[in-house]
Protein backbone atom coordinates (compact mmCIF):
# COMPACT_ATOMS: atom_id res chain seq x y z
CA UNK A 1 0.00 0.00 0.00
CA UNK A 2 1.51 3.31 -1.04
CA UNK A 3 1.62 6.35 1.22
CA UNK A 4 -0.73 8.50 -0.87
CA UNK A 5 -3.98 10.10 0.28
CA UNK A 6 -6.94 8.77 -1.73
CA UNK A 7 -8.85 12.06 -1.49
CA UNK A 8 -6.24 14.81 -1.95
CA UNK A 9 -3.43 12.88 -3.67
CA UNK A 10 -0.83 14.10 -1.18
CA UNK A 11 2.35 12.03 -0.95
CA UNK A 12 5.77 12.22 0.71
CA UNK A 13 8.02 15.18 -0.05
CA UNK A 14 11.81 15.32 0.02
CA UNK A 15 13.66 18.02 1.91
CA UNK A 16 16.66 18.64 4.13
CA UNK A 17 17.54 18.23 7.78
CA UNK A 18 19.48 21.35 8.71
CA UNK A 19 21.84 21.13 11.68
CA UNK A 20 23.00 24.00 13.85
CA UNK A 21 26.10 24.37 11.65
CA UNK A 22 23.83 24.56 8.56
CA UNK A 23 24.89 21.18 7.14
CA UNK A 24 22.12 19.65 5.06
CA UNK A 25 21.18 15.98 4.77
CA UNK A 26 18.28 14.60 2.76
CA UNK A 27 15.10 13.39 4.48
CA UNK A 28 11.48 12.67 3.63
CA UNK A 29 8.46 14.49 4.99
CA UNK A 30 5.74 11.85 5.27
CA UNK A 31 2.03 12.55 5.00
CA UNK A 32 -0.19 12.34 8.10
CA UNK A 33 -1.97 9.26 6.74
CA UNK A 34 -4.46 7.02 8.53
CA UNK A 35 -7.12 4.47 7.63
CA UNK A 36 -10.68 5.62 8.27
CA UNK A 37 -14.04 3.91 7.81
CA UNK A 38 -16.99 5.82 6.35
CA UNK A 39 -20.61 4.87 5.82
CA UNK A 40 -21.35 5.34 2.12
CA UNK A 41 -25.08 6.10 1.94
CA UNK A 42 -25.39 5.85 -1.86
CA UNK A 43 -24.34 2.19 -1.87
CA UNK A 44 -25.54 1.38 1.68
CA UNK A 45 -22.17 -0.02 2.83
CA UNK A 46 -19.06 0.81 4.86
CA UNK A 47 -15.88 1.73 2.97
CA UNK A 48 -12.30 2.10 4.15
CA UNK A 49 -10.07 4.92 2.86
CA UNK A 50 -6.42 5.87 3.39
CA UNK A 51 -6.68 9.61 3.92
CA UNK A 52 -4.63 12.43 5.42
CA UNK A 53 -5.90 15.03 7.89
CA UNK A 54 -6.60 17.49 5.07
CA UNK A 55 -8.57 14.81 3.24
CA UNK A 56 -10.77 14.37 6.31
CA UNK A 57 -11.46 18.11 6.31
CA UNK A 58 -12.39 17.95 2.61
CA UNK A 59 -14.86 15.12 3.32
CA UNK A 60 -16.37 17.08 6.22
CA UNK A 61 -16.75 20.16 4.01
CA UNK A 62 -17.99 18.69 0.71
CA UNK A 63 -19.47 15.36 1.78
CA UNK A 64 -18.23 11.85 1.08
CA UNK A 65 -19.89 11.40 -2.32
CA UNK A 66 -18.68 14.72 -3.75
CA UNK A 67 -15.15 14.22 -2.40
CA UNK A 68 -14.92 10.69 -3.86
CA UNK A 69 -16.25 11.79 -7.25
CA UNK A 70 -13.74 14.65 -7.38
CA UNK A 71 -10.86 12.34 -6.38
CA UNK A 72 -11.80 9.86 -9.10
CA UNK A 73 -12.02 12.55 -11.79
CA UNK A 74 -8.63 13.98 -10.77
CA UNK A 75 -7.10 10.48 -10.79
CA UNK A 76 -6.15 10.22 -7.11
CA UNK A 77 -8.07 6.97 -6.70
CA UNK A 78 -10.39 4.74 -8.67
CA UNK A 79 -13.49 2.83 -7.63
CA UNK A 80 -11.56 -0.47 -7.63
CA UNK A 81 -9.06 0.76 -5.01
CA UNK A 82 -11.78 1.62 -2.48
CA UNK A 83 -12.22 -1.21 0.03
CA UNK A 84 -15.84 -2.15 0.70
CA UNK A 85 -16.13 -3.54 4.23
CA UNK A 86 -19.73 -4.68 4.41
UniProtKB/Swiss-Prot annotation:
InterPro entries: Ribosomal_bL28, Ribosomal_bL28/bL31-like_sf, Ribosomal_bL28_bact-type, Ribosomal_bL28_sf
GO terms under biological process: translation
Gene3D superfamilies the record matches: Ribosomal protein L28/L24 (2.30.170.40)
Keywords: Ribonucleoprotein, Ribosomal protein
GO terms, molecular function: structural constituent of ribosome
Disulfide bond annotation, renumbered to this chain: none
CC terms in the record's Gene Ontology section: ribonucleoprotein complex; ribosome
A Pfam family of this chain: Ribosomal_L28
SUPFAM superfamilies the UniProt entry points to: L28p-like (SSF143800)
Protein family according to the UniProt entry: Belongs to the bacterial ribosomal protein bL28 family.
This protein's name: Large ribosomal subunit protein bL28
Gene: rpmB
